[in-house]
Amino acid sequence: MLLDDKMKVSVAVPVFEYYGRGVEVLDDMLRTISIQTLKEVEVVISDHSINNDIENYCQKNEYGLNIRYIRNVDGRGNPAINTNNAIDNCTGEIIKVFQQDDFLYDTEALEKMYTIMTESNAKWYACGCIHTRDDGHSFFNEMYPNWHDRMILDPGFNFIGGVSVLSIKKEVKTRFDPNVRMCLDVDFYYDAKVKYGMPILHHDVLIANRVRDSDTLMSEVSEEETLEEFKYCHQKHGIVK
């Protein structure tokens, strides 16, 4: 399928080798995009991989999707840089941000999101999500997005969810900060709220998040590093605790 300039939704996907499962988890996501009721969709893939596995997979395009593949050598290993690159290359009216290992839970997910956003003056949006430990064979812990002012103040108050619940209108200029990892989502949410107002908080489960027992970001970042990230965000945004 050819890319064109009439995309309603762009799905921005930063990818890497993902511990040897990069193609496998990306395939799950693309499969769920291929069965969406909304068809005017492009998938923008920004690839931090060193090998060619994902590029070769995208070239096959087995689901016949509008795929825009970009090999990204800048800031390799930094999720913010890779995500921003995917967003910056999107052409759709609405940009749906997606972590590589997550996937759509509802075949009408993109259509619901697009309709709600285009009928609202709000510039950004978060939906509900559900979790899986076994690659979608079973699900648990539905989560619905809610705003909490302590989100940017202290760890443990992100009641919106991870970045895969996020969608923005194309005119939104907020981007992810390359200087943070644990605060990547809450820093973006706070900045977007300051610049664009409250998001649409859509209490419908549209996204499935994979939960990994090992190799998680939380195991890679110490509590001290997390607290330092929050201090950095406070200084950046002029927040006094």
Q: In which residue ranges do the predicted regions lie?
A:
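C-terminal, non-catalytic tails of nucleotide-sugar-dependent glycosyltransferases
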Residues: M1, T216, S222-K241
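Short, well-formed alpha-helical segments that are part of the catalytic scaffolds
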Residues: Y18-I35
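Acidic donor-diphosphate engagement hotspot in glycosyltransferases and nucleotidyltransferases
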Residues: V25, I54, D106-K112, G136, ...
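Acidic donor-binding segment of Leloir-type glycosyltransferases
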Residues: L30-D74
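Glycine-rich, basic loop-to-helix element that forms the pyrophosphate-binding segment
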Residues: V73-C90
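Short beta-strand-to-loop acidic/aromatic patch adjacent to the donor-nucleotide binding site
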Residues: G92-F103
